[in-house]
UniProtKB/Swiss-Prot annotation:
PANTHER family: MITOCHONDRIAL RIBOSOME PROTEIN L39/PROLYL-TRNA LIGASE FAMILY MEMBER (PTHR42753), PROLINE--TRNA LIGASE (PTHR42753:SF2). Belongs to the class-II aminoacyl-tRNA synthetase family. ProS type 1 subfamily. Catalyzes the attachment of proline to tRNA(Pro) in a two-step reaction: proline is first activated by ATP to form Pro-AMP and then transferred to the acceptor end of tRNA(Pro). As ProRS can inadvertently accommodate and process non-cognate amino acids such as alanine and cysteine, to avoid such errors it has two additional distinct editing activities against alanine. One activity is designated as 'pretransfer' editing and involves the tRNA(Pro)-independent hydrolysis of activated Ala-AMP. GO terms for molecular function: aminoacyl-tRNA deacylase activity; ATP binding; proline-tRNA ligase activity. Keywords: Aminoacyl-tRNA synthetase, ATP-binding, Cytoplasm, Ligase, Nucleotide-binding, Protein biosynthesis. Its EC number is 6.1.1.15. It is found in: Cytoplasm. SUPFAM superfamilies: Class II aaRS ABD-related, Class II aaRS and biotin synthetases, YbaK/ProRS associated domain. This is Proline--tRNA ligase. GO terms for biological process: prolyl-tRNA aminoacylation.
Amino acid sequence: MSAFFAPTLRSAPADATIASHQLLMRAGYVRKIANGLFAYLPLGLRVRHKIEAIIREELEAIGCLECTAPVVTPAELWKESGRWYRMGAELLRAKNRLDHELLFSPTAEESFTALVRGDCTSYKHFPLSLYQINAKYRDEIRPRYGLMRAREFTMADAYSFHTDCACLARTYEKFAHAYRAIFRRIGLSVIAVHAHLGAMGGQESEEFMVESAVGDNTLLLCPHCTYAANCEKAVGQRPLPDTHDTHLKDEHEGSDLKTPAAMREVHTPHVKTIEELEHFLHVPAHRCIKTLIYRIDTVPQAAGHFVAVCIRGDLELNESKLEALLRVPSVVLATEQEVYALSGTPVGFIGPVGLAQRAAAAYAARTPAFFPSAAEPASVTSDIPFFSLVADQSVMAMHNAITGALKVDTHLVQVEPGRDFVPDAVADLMLVRAGDRCIHCGAPLYEKKGNELGHLFKLGDKYTRSMHLTFTDEQGVRQFPLMGCYGIGLDRTLASVVENHHDTRGISWPLAISPYAVVLIPIPHTQAPYAAAEALYVQLRTRGVEVLFDDRAERPGVKFADADLIGIPLRVVLSAKTLPRVECTTRCGAHTYFFTQEEASEHIARLLEQLASPESS
């Protein structure tokens, strides 16, 4: 180690708030170059290379072939797929000296589709699975947690091409099996969950999550069956609360709100929220229809496309489900000014009855002050309507409902969905919470926090169709291949291992990905212990054992503290006090063994075999 570059720190940097960030910095694995940008030092690179080797072994075992696509991609490919316009500021865009538009790839669907379309033109060329281990860049607005959410990162991303759905499904399952094997070998227990498609698009998606107290994902899990989903995708049932409202009266009008009758207005001065409506009309929240207006956020900005969403008053809207329904990258709540321009009504009195007609009139009389896209119609995505009304499926089961009347200080009662308003689409848009019922077995769901390490997608023909990749089938007909894509974040995976394998003294690496198997420490630095350590070093290297020889002229306490911090699985000490016996201590469990000098290398090799066995992990 006297000639090795592994600078350790006694304390963590102030901006390192989670264990992995603190320990990787303190133990000399990485160094921060700028916000969200990290350099790997020799120890860190050895760990990453071992993770890469495991990934390569498992992917090549299922017939996936390695190649490399450029990190810097021409904008033309992303314009073909449409993602140049749909993805926002997270894309780092640039121009070269010839004024050609480029981007730093956050993912590589476009590049691999372009790679394949020039050479794979017959059904005989498929199925085909390709992967790369390469750098990516995503311009995170708030990079944090060290390697967990950095701007530049390394991914093992794979792409498969198929002639039919059955073939895609088989390959998808092979990747799922390979991913489980990868994470098991690395030393992580993962949870596979149903996931939101997001900007990737496609037909089906699954994430591999590792449980973490600092996870940025909320998972909904069933304790009785196998159902598991990211909260963005989770479905569930929320039973109606037992309110005993068998004969609720409108105290202001004296009429029975439970009696099916024609819709009518009720004066509700200064009543703008569901909670205020509950108190004013003495009705439970689940009797009310909550209407929210969103602007569809596209690139370039199209501030003239809106969607009104109706949901039962006691439920919350899942914006990810709304984005998936609309097939748009993101939605944002409309401003109060936009709501008024669209409906002629202030926030608090919006409802679905007559809203589409109000929106149509607003569009006919639109002004750039409220709808900037009206001044530049060419910038608006043509297949998105100006206004649409959608409803959560809970709304369509309601009767005698209460909602805003599109009039100040006024609500409508005895509203019948389907009679008094008809949404353009009905879907599951509810945000599922812990305690909601599993749709498969009825058990209450519970929550866990997790970090995403891997992701599988069935993309269908989303990219092959938009980028005109075709093949000739057995009947001579041109078809679009179906795609799958699969990714593992190496940096996140490395950091997650540290999150799951550390203690108060430092990191405790699983042997499979530890930078070295053994750290060899002679005490003192000179005379007999050093000579004995050199001899043992040669014997271990002859056996193929990776050894870090701490030959620094440091105090024993410094060497021991650094060994614990760095986290190498086996510490071997040759001390003037104990020779000719050799002291071996495991980092995990702190078990200590003594062997003679003559037998030390053989016993150490056996001990490492035990540490490598699944039972020891």
